């Protein structure tokens, strides 16, 4: 069922239904009661990469790129997100220094409501399920760097922001990064 003002159909592809259903990328959709297609067949991600729209609605993988809910978010919500991003700029830079070349980018996200962090791929990159399929078939898969997204409202991220000890900050950052994989 599509909500009023919804201009995209959202989907998530995973190895199985349970993994798709429990993806951290779905948290904001659950909170806003937006339905997402849960895809668990091996061919689904490939198929969705070739289907650009359905009945005039653009299809969007919720685990790729930046998340734009369009008219489903009010102007006030968008302004609050921009303010939060500004407040966390210093933390983002500190985390970039720690994770360095492991990621393409570190950024604050509103995609997460319960989880402290997640990794997403760029909009035009191959998804993780497709990578696993190709690797299991013995195909060479191009190396890509993912985007490390942080939930600014999570207590762990807030603790990280306040951490002054650089060694402890690095350790906590790397644990958070590893848990996101």
Residue ranges of model-derived segments:
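Long, intrinsically disordered, charge-dense linkers/tails
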Residues: 1-181
């Amino acid at each position: 069922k599509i909500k009023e003002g919804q201009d995209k159909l959202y989907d998530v592809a995973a190895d199985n239904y349970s993994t798709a259903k429990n993806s951290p990328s779905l948290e904001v959709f659950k909170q806003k009661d937006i339905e997402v297609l849960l895809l668990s067949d091996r061919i689904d991600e490939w198929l969705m990469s070739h289907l650009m729209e359905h009945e005039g609605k653009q299809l969007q993988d919720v685990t790729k790129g930046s998340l734009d809910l369009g008219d489903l978010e009010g102007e006030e919500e968008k302004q609050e997100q921009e303010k939060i991003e500004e407040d966390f700029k210093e933390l983002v830079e500190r985390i970039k220094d720690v994770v360095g070349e492991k990621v393409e980018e570190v950024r604050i996200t509103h995609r997460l409501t319960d989880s402290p962090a997640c990794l997403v791929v760029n909009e035009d990159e191959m998804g993780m399920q497709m990578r696993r399929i190709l690797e299991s078939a013995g195909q060479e898969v191009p190396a890509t760097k993912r985007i490390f997204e942080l939930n600014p409202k999570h207590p762990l991220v807030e603790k990280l922001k306040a951490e002054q000890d650089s060694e402890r900050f690095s350790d906590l950052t790397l644990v958070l990064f590893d848990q996101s994989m």
